[in-house]
Amino acid sequence: MTPEKINFIQPVESGKPDDFLILSSSWEERCLGVAQRLKSYSCKKILINVYDNSTTKKEEIYKELKNLLKQKGEVQAVNSKQSNPLDGIKRMLYHIKSNFQNVNPKISLDISCFTRKHLLQLLNCLDCNNLLGNTNFYYSQPTEYYTENNSSNAEGIKSICIAETFSGENLSSRDTALIIFLNFEGRRALALWQELQPNVALPIIPFPSVKAGWNEKVQNQNKLLLSTLNLSWEDLEKSSPLNPDDTKELLLRLTSLKPGQNNILKHSNYNFMIAPLGTKPQVLGIFKYCRLFPDKISIAYPSPIKYKDLPESFPTESTWLIDKSINWER
């Protein structure tokens, strides 16, 4: 579907409350974006993911988030570790199943402030449990991103691993092709490429940019990686920063996992790895692609040492309805 900028969140089924609203608290003010747009919205249960490593800023924003939500449904905090969210996902699943006995509850899911790894694993868990078939997905875009000194809020690289539940084929007879989504985290992307040393690397950039000047920021963030790969900006594959279907269709075109496509890489020749360092809507598109081919694709994820406690964060500029799972391929 074409992403739609919205002023107010509507329930999945018009005139009826949702079963669940799921979102994540954060140090980023944009985690308030959906909560600020709930004028006539209501739901039975609100599940707020709350990461560890609490700071004063996180506590202040979380308090404001709860105040915005308390009149819209029963609020339940779900604690999780930012570095390893699987236990938090299990708790989220428990709360959903404890409050809904059938498949495919009506869910509004704000993907804005989950980590990329967490988002992929949460989506996979819900999908495997037949809980994702009636979900509307929202994304809040901030007014700006922190990119001081071509850095981001993710500091250092703690480890590089294949994300649990996303470990695909890895045959010794094949070369490795790394499809790496780039955005404002050039150092993490470079470290990932240096560690994996793939036979083929295909960088993908978010384009067209949502805001003027962001293309230049992405170029500056990833200048060293692109020069190492001997690639110019014009050489790069591009996908929409807001439309998950654009990302899914690009991945289908790049690979040969779907018959009839004019493919760049043949699956029979490569072990495919995807590095999801782009936008959250692109991450949703990656998931939509991976779910079509279970056990074929690996997700490579560079975990940072920590996330900086930044002196400033940026409020929501726009909130988008970016997808509806009722339209997904089954």
Language model region names:
Residues 1-106, 114-330:
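Long, low-complexity, Lys/Arg-enriched
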